[in-house]
C-alpha cells in the first residue's frame, strides 16, 4: 500500500500547489482562542516528565489535549523543527509509518500533507492537508511560536483511490513558548482534532493523547539535538 500510495503523491502535490498557493483559507479563530486560553485545562497525567492536560471544547464531543514541559532551550530552535515538514518522516519516530510532505511554501506559511495508517481492523486510514505558520494566530498573540489548522479537502480524492482514507478537516494546534525564569521556557503543544469516521470517542481521545505526547517528545528531542550540534 505504501508504494501504491507514493505513486500518486507527485500528481497530488502538483495539483495542490496550484490550488492552494493563491487561495485564502480562513483560520478557525474561535478554536484557536479556546486552545490559547489558560482556563479549564484539567491535568490528565502528571506522572512523567511531561504534563498532559485536557480541555472540553464547547459543542464538541472530543477533548483538546495539551502536553507541556519546562526546558532550557531557545524558542527559535523549537520553531525551526516544527516548521521542518520535509524532515518529519525522519525525526517524528514515534509516529510509526505516518507519511508527511511539504506541498507548498510561501513567505507567510507552509502547506503540508499527512497520511496516517490506522492499524485496526475495519477502520480506514486517515489523511489531511494543513497550513502551518511560524508565529502567533492573532496580533496580540505573543506566546504562540507556531500555529496550524487543517485545510478543506480539495484534491485529496487522488490519494483516496489508493488508500480509501478518511479525510480530516476539523482541527488546529498551537505551539506555546512562555518564559518562566532565566534560561527556562515552558513549551506546550495544544491541539484539537476530530479524526472522523466510526471510531468511538473514548478511543479517539486515547489516540489523540498518545499522538500529541509522542509528537511533542520527538520534536523536543530533535530540537535539543540541533541545539547541541550548534554549540
At which residue positions do the language-model features occur?
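Sec-dependent signal peptide recognition
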Residues: 3-11
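Hydrophobic h-region of N-terminal signal peptides that target proteins for export
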Residues: 12-20
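Eukaryotic helix-grip
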Residues: 22-231
